[in-house]
Amino acid sequence: MLACLTRGNLLDVLQEGFNEQQLQAYVAWVNAQLKKRPAVKPVQDLRQDLRDGVILAYLIEIVAGEKLSGVQLSPGNQQEMKNNVEKVLQFVASKKIRMHQTSAKDIVDGNLKSIMRLVLALAAHFKPGSSRTVNQGRDSRAPLQSHRPHCATAVAQGAAAALADVCHDMSRSGRDVFRYRQRNSSMDEEIENPYWSVRALVQQYEGQQRSPSESSCSSLTSPSPIHSAKSESIITQSEEKADFVIIPAEGIENRTEGTDSPLSRDWRPGSPGTYLETSWEEQLLEQQEYLEKEMEEAKKMISGLQALLLNGSLPEDEQERPLALCEPGVNPEEQLIIIQSRLDQSMEENQDLKKELLKCKQEARNLQGIKDALQQRLTQQDTSVLQLKQELLRANMDKDELHNQNVDLQRKLDERNRLLGEYKKELGQKDRLLQQHQAKLEEALRKLSDVSYHQVDLERELEHKDVLLAHCMKREADEATNYNSHNSQSNGFLLPTAGKGATSVSNRGTSDLQLVRDALRSLRNSFSGHDPQHHTIDSLEQGISSLMERLHVMETQKKQERKVRVKSPRTQVGSEYRESWPPNSKLPHSQSSPTVSSTCTKVLYFTDRSLTPFMVNIPKRLEEVTLKDFKAAIDREGNHRYHFKALDPEFGTVKEEIFHDDDAIPGWEGKIVAWVEEDHGEN
């Protein structure tokens, strides 16, 4: 970088403690580069001329050989100026140029420190070859230095002077820490080893041995290394006022960032606050730490001086041959003092080695503790990993179980869907069957309505027959009257004309009854075997049978009245009517026994082979008749089922089936109505 910065003025840049000479040096270097572009005006003020970014873009184009694109050569507002500076900073970042953190806003606002940092970074990165190093400057100015000491006494006196100068600097550091740090930083930039002054003395001593022609010993005129360094720095500054010396950027960064002083830490970019803003307590603590560090360095310097005085070399330098305890021609008291000093030096070194050993042991214990802690932490982490693996295994097992459950549920869902489809099909079939049955029911209702109409016709015909029967009975009464009046003339027989009329009436009644039976048979065949309309047909058939029975009873009574007087030819009609009843009954039927006593029970039963009911009389009271008596009365072979008409208090008229022979048979209106069906063993 610039020569003024290489001799301790970098802290001035960091602290903005600029002087006019430094600013002019920066301006001169920038103008020297801009002379390569005659069209560009030279720079007068760094704050004003570089804040728009145009001069910086020209400077990059000159020193780097690359032209920045998108730069506004005549920015009209702050935003365009900021954009130009941001492009410059982006170029610096893309080239990986080492520079303290700088923002575009600082440069646009005219922050001189940020501008000088940027110029410093560009000069250090792109113009390192044109500079002269500090060491070369020293070599060129070597003849200007003072003469070297020529004996060990002069070396000791020079070391004492250097030690006194260091103590004086340390005493001044407590009063003015900033000035001391500036001096210390200027010295550290040249020589970084704490034994730099001692090494300078050793080099002078060795130079004296290499040049034996210089034999004079002058201790009072030999300057201290510190003053020599100071004078050298002053000479360097005076020589380089008109020239610019660029050093590598790595050295600048190492000196500015690698320093351990609190001042450099306070002024590091990005810190929360500056050194001037810290409280006085923190300043005192920092000064105390810094003084302790300086004391340690002073102790090391004293030890090095003592070793130099006693052994003729530094402690860290390797000695090829051991030194003798006593030198010839030396006073014994001086030898004793030297030996005592060596013993003290050895004891001091022994104490230092012990301290180093204790420190190493403490570090070893700390490392062992850290190792144990890390081992314990590793064990805990292994345990945690095992637990996580177990949890992962359990999670995988749960996942597999859930997957299996999902598969089972999916299978059940498919089965349910299949059953649902089958149920839908069955429901559709049942709907079709229901529609068919509904159609059949409508057809049956239509037929039933026809039957009801036919029944009405039959009832009308029956009423007509009743009228005819009444008319016939009236005629019979008239004939009986005529018979009584002509009994002597007819000799107990009716007139032939009367007999012919009765016969015609009986034949007509038989034909009407046969017509009713045929109609009921055809109506029964139109229904299925378990149709509920059979009950209606049975009731109708029972009513007709009861009506015929009453007619038969009336006819029988009339015949009994006439039997005493004359045998009427109309008995032949009655015998023809009785032929429809079963002749194989053991008990006398109602047709063969005209008079039924109160001890007999009339039984009317139907069979599945004939639509015409059968009637028998059982010589027992109604409540005493059992199933065994009924079976003996009808006398039918094979297995049969017996149903009897009964009155249920809840459902009304029902058919009750009797199984046991000893069970009593229910009655219906003073008689027994039964249905006998053959049992084929299906149920």
From Swiss-Prot:
Residues 279-452 form a coiled coil. The coiled-coil domain mediates interaction with MAP3K4 and inhibition of AXIN1-mediated JNK activation through MAP3K4. Phosphorylated on tyrosine and serine residues. PROSITE patterns: CH (PS50021), DIX (PS50841). Residues 207-235, 482-509, 556-594 are annotated as: Disordered. Changing K655A: Loss of interaction with DVL2. Abolishes activation of Wnt signaling. This is Dixin. Residues 482-492 have a biased composition (Polar residues). The lineage of its organism: Eukaryota, Metazoa, Chordata, Craniata, Vertebrata. Disulfide bonds: none annotated. One of its GO terms (molecular function) is gamma-tubulin binding. Residues 600-680 form the DIX domain. It is found in: Cell junction, Focal adhesion; Cytoplasm, Cytoskeleton, Stress fiber; Cytoplasm. One of its GO terms (biological process) is cerebral cortex radially oriented cell migration. Belongs to the DIXDC1 family. The modification Phosphoserine is found at S186, S231, S590. Positive effector of the Wnt signaling pathway; activates WNT3A signaling via DVL2. Regulates JNK activation by AXIN1 and DVL2. GO terms for cellular component: cytosol; focal adhesion; glutamatergic synapse; postsynapse; stress fiber. Keywords: Actin-binding, Cell junction, Coiled coil, Cytoplasm, Cytoskeleton, Developmental protein, Lipoprotein, Myristate, Phosphoprotein, Ubl conjugation, Wnt signaling pathway. Residues 127-300 are annotated as: Actin-binding. Residues 211-228 have a biased composition (Low complexity). Isoform 1 but not isoform 2 binds filamentous actin. Interacts with the complex composed of DVL2 and Rac. Interacts with AXIN1; competes with MAP3K1. Interacts with MAP3K4 preventing MAP3K4 interaction with AXIN1. Directly interacts (via DIX domain) with DVL2 (via DIX domain). Interacts with gamma-tubulin. Ubiquitously expressed with higher expression in cardiac and skeletal muscles. Residues 20-127 form the Calponin-homology (CH) domain.
